[in-house]
C-alpha cells in the first residue's frame, strides 16, 4: 500500500485513469460491434456509416495510447474487408 502522501495521490490518480480508460475501451468496442452487426444483417449503408464512427474511435484510442496503433490498423483493415466482401 502507499506509504507517502505522494504515493497515495498517485494510487488515486491511477485508479481514476484506469476506470476512465476502461470506459473508453468499452465505447470503442461498442462502435466496432455496431459495424459487425450491420455486416451480419447485410446492411451495407449502415455498416459503412458505422465504420466511419468506428474508424475515428479506433484512431482516437491509438492516438491516446489505449490500444497499439498496429491493433487499430489491423481492426480497421479487417472490418473494411468484411464490408467490401458484402458487395
Curated annotation (Swiss-Prot):
Residues 1-27 are annotated as: Disordered. One of its GO terms (cellular component) is small ribosomal subunit. It comes from the Bacteria. GO terms for biological process: translation. InterPro entries: Ribosomal_bS20 (IPR002583), Ribosomal_bS20_sf (IPR036510). Keywords: Ribonucleoprotein, Ribosomal protein, RNA-binding, rRNA-binding. Residues 9-20 have a biased composition (Basic residues). GO terms for molecular function: small ribosomal subunit rRNA binding; structural constituent of ribosome. Pfam families: Ribosomal_S20p. Binds directly to 16S ribosomal RNA. Belongs to the bacterial ribosomal protein bS20 family. This is Small ribosomal subunit protein bS20. It comes from Hydrogenovibrio crunogenus (strain DSM 25203 / XCL-2).
Amino acid at each position: 500500500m502507499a506509504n507517502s502522501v505522494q504515493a497515495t495521490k498517485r494510487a488515486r490518480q491511477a485508479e481514476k485513469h484506469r476506470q476512465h480508460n476502461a470506459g473508453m475501451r468499452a465505447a470503442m468496442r461498442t462502435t466496432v460491434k455496431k459495424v459487425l452487426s450491420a455486416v451480419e444483417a447485410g446492411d451495407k449503408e449502415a455498416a459503412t456509416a458505422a465504420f466511419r464512427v468506428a474508424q475515428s474511435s479506433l484512431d482516437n484510442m491509438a492516438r491516446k495510447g489505449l490500444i497499439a496503433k498496429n491493433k487499430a490498423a489491423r481492426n480497421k483493415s479487417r472490418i473494411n474487408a468484411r464490408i467490401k466482401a458484402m458487395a
